[in-house]
Amino acid sequence: MGDERPHYYGKHGTPQKYDPTFKGPIYNRGCTDVICCVFLLVAIVGYVAVGIIAWTHGDPRKVIYPTDSRGEFCGQEGTKNENKPYLFYFNIVKCASPLVLLEFQCPTPQICVEKCPNRYLTYLNARSSRDFEYYKQFCVPGFKNNKGVAEVLRDGDCPAVLIPSKPLVRRCFPAIHAYKGVLMVGNETTYEDGHGARKNITDLVEGAKKANGVLEARQLAMRIFEDYTVSWYWIIIGLVIAMAMSLLFIILLRFLAGIMVWVMIIMVILVLGYGIFHCYMEYSRLRGEAGSDVSLVDLGFQTDFRVYLHLRQTWLAFMIILSILEVIIILLLIFLRKRILIAIALIKEASRAVGYVMCTMLYPLVTFFLLCLCIAYWASTAVFLSTSNEAVYKIFDDGLCPFTAKTCNPETFPSSNESRQCPNARCQFAFYGGESGYHRALLGLQIFNAFMFFWLANFVLALGQVTLAGAFASYYWALRKPDDLPAFPLFSAFGRALRYHTGSLAFGALILAIVQIIRVILEYLDQRLKAAENKFAKCLMTCLKCCFWCLEKFIKFLNRNAYIMIAIYGTNFCTSARNAFFLLMRNIIRVAVLDKVTDFLFLLGKLLIVGSVGILAFFFFTHRIRIVQDTAPPLNYYWVPILTVIVGSYLIAHGFFSVYGMCVDTLFLCFCEDLERNDGSQERPYFMSPELRDILLKGSAEEGKRAEAEE
């Protein structure tokens, strides 16, 4: 083994040599990767310019309000349609046309109305003044009864027939319902089309389906939004509970690291065990109930997730998943029991480091605030870009007009050649688009918007990692702790990172952002190719997605350790990444023993907090806690606040545990350097604590013997 060490070190770089002047993070350093810093500043200026252009041309009202045939918004304050919030279709049957799928607009006149029609009435039968006044509100604005019936219907001034309707996503759709298996509107199974003929209700269904198909996602979003409006208060309470649990756990970990780790392990096993028991009880309870034996495949996708909870197969699937997870965790604990003891020692040392630099626990709030700014700017820019198209008008005709679907100008159309050749044609609003250079560049601007979001978000995360690494490295390389600790180590590390290493952070974030935007493009292409039958293309796409996923994980790992070296030595990104990689390769056994085991333990801690808060949220929002069952709000989908609480709890727990994770990684890298620089003698003493030295060196020796035995 001894003969192989020179070759091994030569292969993976040269070990650090003893330097009596080295006392931790170097203070006399220079700026690194200045070119990348300039690129970042130029990109930010360009990003601001894109935002200004988007905000100038964009109009979010196009998403919020429906638009009539003249491109005017329904229900918008300050307009003539302020009191007309609903969109009315003259002939809903025309919405069964393929044009709906191509242009997202029905080929029939549409107007804004105060309320949807609530009774049957044809234009032919609206003879009395009372009926005509009612009918007139569904005609085009400014309609005057100075034409014959045939001319009115030909010119599209009024609908041929009014059908009882109800509003759905601010649009009037026929009030269709089933009675004893028969489709009806009101009390009728057929309707008069206004031209003297009677048609079947199924024609209305087809038209409503096509129009409604474009709006189903928006309807789901509206219901989810309604759930948020009535449950946001309780969601915040759930997130506060998650924050309190995370903070309490971290505080206890500071003083009772060993005990808390074992308590965490046992609690995770118990929580999963309870989940298995609860799934089994629900599975048994549904035995014999009507409809509970329907399979998930036969049921298909349902937006109301409560339907799935009435199926035995759902609870069986949950029980199997939790059982597999329980078995995996127990097996890992059995095989990693000795390594867990070593990892606990490292966590104890990390707890002491956090205790001496307590302000590091508040830094995730800074990262959270900066990430919120990035998300808010990206989201608002994306919305304004997507709504910066102009109103496009198309020619619609019921007959065989050769100009159908061609672009037109509503102001000049009545006197145009197209109008003369196709007397029944109409020039009406079709969709939002445009053919200018700006409109052709919208897709590229959206990609740039997404890319800049990834770059800035990764930069914010990198800034946090370098800052925390600098603070914890100052703790490790203090020979007499805490006497040799510098004043305000966190603020000093933050200042050094921004002053000297903005370019290096931008470089690392840029590499990661490029990989992430490629993954987004691959996901987009994969969605477009789903309908294709080319198996080679599908296989190639799957392989590319897998490769770039692995590449992203590797770059994140390398960047994290490179940032630690930047915080300590102040070298540029490439040098830091190379030195960190070689240092890890020279200590590959310790990396496998410690780094991943501590990550596993922290993951269990996150699962414990998320599982506990998630179970509490489930029982609360499903009205299963008797004391407060009347307090829980009524919801369309109770999974909306539950999932929000679960995801939010994980992000909160991850924010707190990320401090510990960065601390462990920094201490581990410093420990590896300490072993190479020093030998534990009085002339070259170790900087690590005696407790950490004893258990880490002992564990490393055991792993080395095991590796030699395997060879």
From Swiss-Prot:
Chain positions carrying an annotated carbohydrate:
187, 200, 417
Q: Which residues lie on this side of the membrane: Cytoplasmic?
A: 1-33, 254-256, 337-364, 462-504, 585-599, 660-711
User: Where, per the database record, does this protein carry Phosphothreonine?
Assistant: 14
Keywords for this protein: Antiport, Cell membrane, Glycoprotein, Membrane, Mitochondrion, Mitochondrion outer membrane, Phosphoprotein, Transmembrane, Transmembrane helix, Transport
User: Where is the chain membrane-spanning?
Assistant: 34-54, 233-253, 257-277, 316-336, 365-385, 441-461, 505-525, 564-584, 600-620, 639-659
What is the top-level taxon of the source organism?
A: Eukaryota
Summarize the subunit comment: Interacts with COCH.
Q: What is this protein called?
A: Choline transporter-like protein 2
Whichever gene encodes this chain, its name is SLC44A2
